[in-house]
């Protein structure tokens, strides 16, 4: 159904769409009240039905998406009962684990992100789409509870979700191991689906911030830079000889394979990258919303907008606006939550915030967006400028694996340290956060990392004797440690990698 809608939207041809209308009609005829009871084992049909509704306007599709969503959890034993009727079970399904498939409670009663992470965020996506479409405040509140729990207590700094290989699932709050992380690529993609639907209901910058975190880190890390190899799992620490080999770590493959049996992530990643325009913009009656600093030419209802972006390496983005009518409308641009200051200009003139400036044009700031209301003319240009400082990030101390450690970010990009840049050993490095002002920013001039911004960070390497245990503390050697964008790791052969680094304060 999703493919049929995508093809219809891209080409205007409805042949496949009509085929899938027949399929959707068959689903509606077979399942529902006074018919076969049932809910999807993997929550994708709900997304498909909602997309079919948006494409065709057929209310039956939306109504049945609601049925499937609201039926879940009414009988937590549904999948176990179904499995007992036959002598086989679908690969990967755990019928008796009612949290695995989010059937432990109704969608309105669920307080915590649990179970199979992809199933969960796909279900949340359909919930949020339905809530926004029908302006359902109760359903949106349920989505908001799940969003907050997931992003505030169960998400890696890279945007990865679903921390355990057991059931490809969420675990306990703050349980975010780095070297055993699962963080499936599809789960990160699903979180972007969810965020986009939440933005339809509430223009809050936290949803766009999450999309940005995923797109520059936890999603594109799933594909090798040449596009030929892929990760299913996205760890935050890798140690060859342990990762991929020892029990408990076998799922953490230290190099991207060419393919794998469950090949959901590669095509999902490709469709995400090729459909970024859907996630970058929204449009209401009197506002155009820009959620992401992505260079492109957008053809919208009120205007054509050309975006020229130097993001994420430099802090400069411009919007050239060609209005289609003479009406006054606002352009709302998301300002990333990490920015402490920024400058906005219109046709070279600096804009100030709020109307107290008595200027003809100004901007207002609300929930992570700047709003510029104007009667636009051809080739009016908005420019956003800001500094791109290196930021030291610390985890909540409830994340026990990260106590005493720090991670580095610049802009939206999370950084990682690889052995190939650091004498083959990142485990004995301690970055000196007190000397961060001495850090050097380098733009790689050649090779597979060409064009990327790399960081050279003052650090200390610990060196010990051969003894397993000793009363003598390790020797400290001052070094410069190099960090690369996390999404680029694993492109230069088998080696160590680490995001959260031990720190030293001099």
Q: Predicted segments — roles?
A:
Residues 1-13, 46-58, 122-137, 175, ...:
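Well-ordered alpha-helical scaffold segments within catalytic/enzyme domains
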Residues 65, 143, 209-217, 222-322, ...:
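C-terminal beta-rich recognition modules with glycine/proline-rich loops and embedded aromatic residues
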Residues 129-153, 176-228, 239:
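Catalytic-core region of carbohydrate-active enzymes that cleave or remodel glycosidic bonds
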Residues 328-349:
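Beta-strand-rich binding/interaction modules
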Residues 18-35, 64-80, 93-96, 143-158, ...:
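Long, well-ordered core segments of solenoidal/helical folds
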Residues 15-16, 57-61, 73-100, 138, ...:
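Proline-centered turn/helix-capping motifs that create local helix->coil transitions or kinks
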Residues 1-24, 33-71:
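Acidic/aromatic-lined carbohydrate-recognition and catalytic surfaces
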Residues 13, 29-42, 75, 89-125, ...:
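Solvent-exposed loop and edge beta-strand segments that line ligand/cofactor-binding
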